[in-house]
Amino acid sequence: MPEDISRYLFICFKSIFLGIIQGFTEFLPISSTAHLKVVPYLFGWNDLGVSFSASIQLGSAVAIIYYFRNHISLIINSFFSSFNPSKGFKDENSRLFLYIFVASIPILVFGLLIKLYWPNYSDSNLRGLFSIAITSIVMALLLALSEIYGKRNKLFVDINLNDVIKLGLAQSLALFPGVSRSGITLTSALFSGIERKTAARLSFLVGIPAVSISGLVELFSLFRVLSVIDIIPIIIGIISSFFSSIFAIDLFLKFLSKNNTLVFVYYRLAFGIFILTTL
């Protein structure tokens, strides 16, 4: 096999593998960005960069929309059919449309500001392994505290605007590698007293705009500079991410029906310590 073909097939293999990693870790509170940084390092692969990582998140975004398609359809229909300007939102689904919008504002605004005023952010020390390790440990401790002090008695109908504003601000912290978007939003929701499975579903739903927009922006930027043959591995990564995301969403929701999140606390502590002591 010619060397160029062999190299290209290996790039496609890496895209499939990293797509699986992305999809599986995007919805668990363990940070997909951190794993997409650490795993290539362990295998001696080149860091594929922020654009690749953000682009393959599109597979995860499509997976959320597909998995929750019935709920999302209900949310949209409720918003446009039951909203009365004089009375406000009548039911939880129409309010949830507003909540998703509100929770998305901080991360989109801060993300845009970073894009405009910190062009070298992707090469900063914040994306280094040491920063990721420390962040992983800190986020593990916060998740543990949310399990200890969160009352976990709120369902969707009980969620209010204050809960969502706090969750949206927390989600903006996910711009820093190692934080975990699903992890920090789940932690915020638990601190607000939201029941675990409801907290996870809310975390997934509010992530749709941010993950989708981020992925589309980076993918379009790659389309402008890469050839079709170079784009194919990214598309493969997106598809791989989609299927592993579906599996991860279903697995995590079933897990939270009967368990707490402490196993992820232990994992993140071990992950952070492993990076500090090994890499």
UniProtKB/Swiss-Prot annotation:
Catalytic activities: di-trans,octa-cis-undecaprenyl diphosphate + H2O = di-trans,octa-cis-undecaprenyl phosphate + phosphate + H(+)
GO cellular component, one term: plasma membrane
EC number: 3.6.1.27
InterPro entries: UppP
UniProt keywords, alphabetically: Antibiotic resistance, Cell inner membrane, Cell membrane, Cell shape, Cell wall biogenesis/degradation, Hydrolase, Membrane, Peptidoglycan synthesis, Transmembrane, Transmembrane helix
GO MF annotation terms: undecaprenyl-diphosphatase activity
GO biological process: cell wall organization; peptidoglycan biosynthetic process; regulation of cell shape; response to antibiotic
Main location: membrane
Alphabetical list of PANTHER family matching this protein: UNDECAPRENYL-DIPHOSPHATASE
Role of this protein: Catalyzes the dephosphorylation of undecaprenyl diphosphate (UPP). Confers resistance to bacitracin.
Other information: Bacitracin is thought to be involved in the inhibition of peptidoglycan synthesis by sequestering undecaprenyl diphosphate, thereby reducing the pool of lipid carrier available.
Family note: Belongs to the UppP family.
Protein name, entry field: Undecaprenyl-diphosphatase
Organism of this sequence: Prochlorococcus marinus (strain NATL2A)
Gene behind this protein: uppP
